[in-house]
A protein has these predicted regions:
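Intrinsically disordered, low-complexity segments enriched in polar/charged residues with Gly/Pro
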Residues: 2-7, 23, 35-39, 117-118, ...
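HotDog/MaoC-like acyl-thioester-processing domains
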Residues: 12-98, 164-166, 171-183
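Catalytic strand-loop segment that frames the active site of acyl-thioester-processing enzymes
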Residues: 1, 68-133, 147
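Generic hydrophobic/packing signal
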Residues: 43, 62-64, 107-115, 133-135, ...
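Detector for Asparagine
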Residues: 8-10, 53, 114
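A conserved acidic, glycine/proline-rich C-terminal tail/linker
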Residues: 145-175
């Protein structure tokens, strides 16, 4: 496709666990870029990845939308329509976990593929004070709370409202019915 993940900023991840996956179970992975659309700040890229068991049954599907910024464009906003807040009152959430992000843990999670997650110069060139955690790392923080509930299947979307820098403190808030969460 000629499209690199370098510099991309995750805006949305939809994670579908079709059925329970057993740790160590062999899975086949396939994926595709489903669309590339111009937006005022660059391109909006949609991708889909599937994890199937050896019988070909879908176990997990991941659909993502990301912004590939074009640094020559000067638009303040412009990655497409911004969804309404998923959590209108963050103060109503129960504090489930607290995380202290560190450069070391972020580098350990994202060592290759997109330098804005592990190189200060690349992050600053993209307009960030420091490297940002990868979308997968953010999803990991959210799903850790869900997996402890022993859920066999799920379908949820993660909206990335702002970047999380590799040296920030953050907390995970959960509504009482596990209908929404926020970092």
């Amino acid at each position: 496709s000629g499209i690199s993940a370098e510099g991309n900023i995750n805006m949305l991840t939809q994670l579908i666990q079709h059925q329970k996956v057993v740790l160590g179970e062999p899975l086949e992975v396939s994926g595709e870029i489903t669309s590339v659309d111009p937006v005022p700040r660059g391109h909006r890229i949609s991708t889909s990845v599937w994890f199937r068991n050896i019988s070909g049954e879908a176990m997990i599907s991941v659909h993502r939308v990301s912004l590939k910024p074009d640094l020559s464009l000067k638009a303040e906003r412009g990655a497409g329509d911004r969804p309404e807040p998923v959590v209108p009152d963050v103060g109503a959430l129960r504090r489930a976990r607290t995380y202290q992000l560190t450069p070391e843990s972020t580098k350990a999670y994202s060592r290759e593929g997109n330098a804005i997650h592990y190189e200060l110069e690349a992050a600053q060139k993209a307009g960030f004070r420091a490297p940002i955690i990868g979308g997968g790392q953010g999803v990991h923080f959210l799903t850790a709370e869900i997996w402890e509930q022993g859920i066999a299947s799920l379908d949820f979307s993660v909206y990335f409202r702002r970047p999380l820098l590799w040296d920030q403190s953050l907390w995970l808030g959960v509504d009482p019915h596990l209908q929404s969460m926020a970092l």
